[in-house]
């Protein structure tokens, strides 16, 4: 098993992170009519990009490393003093299904031990993600946003609550 570490990313690492993100999301593009993931308007997509995340005070961009090789990334946003949302989470396809994602999410919990509630969202078409978050990572589906024809998707909203 590789050693998983997290490092806060710098803006000059953006291009490398975007390449990994693109490959990671391409794996699921077959579930969407236009092959675009996430299936939102251009404005919403722009607001959720890695580049935009570097500009937000309440968000931190991370690189995920397996044995010192960058294999993924995430954007963690502070919601309240004890609640955070993982706005983006992605791994290189070569690392998916090998325990790296589960261990990376555990590393985020260790990085922010004061966080009592973790949230994340994934499209309803990507059931593999939902199964992973629920069965492997201990998240619970707390809401299902209905299918939106304009966005071509519904969304699962997950939470994981910790006792501190």
Residue ranges and their predicted role:
Residues 121-125, 130, 134-156:
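Conserved catalytic-core motifs of GNAT/GCN5-like acyltransferases
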Residues 111-124:
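Conserved GNAT acetyl-CoA-binding A-motif
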Residues 91, 97-110, 135:
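Conserved acetyl-CoA-binding loop-helix of GNAT-fold acetyltransferases
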Residues 89-96, 122-124:
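A short, internal acetyl-CoA/4′-phosphopantetheine-binding micro-motif in the GNAT/acyltransferase core
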Residues 43-63, 72:
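A short helix-loop-beta-strand connector motif used in the catalytic cores of GNAT acetyltransferases and
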Residues 22-50:
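Conserved GNAT-fold acetyl-CoA-binding loop/helix
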Residues 61-63, 69-78, 85, 90:
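Conserved beta-strand in the GNAT
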């Amino acid at each position: 098993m590789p050693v998983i570490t997290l490092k806060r990313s710098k803006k000059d690492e953006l291009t490398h992170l975007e390449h990994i993100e693109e490959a990671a999301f391409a794996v699921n593009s077959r579930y969407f009519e236009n092959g675009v993931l996430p299936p939102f308007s251009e404005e919403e997509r722009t607001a959720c990009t890695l580049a935009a995340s570097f500009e937000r005070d309440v968000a931190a961009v991370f690189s995920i490393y397996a044995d010192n090789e960058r294999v993924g990334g995430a954007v963690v946003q502070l919601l309240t003093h004890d609640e955070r949302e993982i706005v983006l989470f992605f791994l290189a396809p070569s690392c998916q299904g090998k325990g790296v994602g589960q261990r990376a999410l555990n590393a985020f919990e260790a990085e922010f031990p004061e966080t009592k509630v973790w949230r994340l969202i994934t499209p309803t078409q990507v059931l593999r993600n939902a199964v992973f978050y629920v069965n492997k990572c201990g998240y619970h589906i707390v809401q299902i946003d209905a299918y939106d024809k304009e966005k071509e998707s519904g969304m699962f909203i997950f939470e994981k609550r910790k006792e501190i």
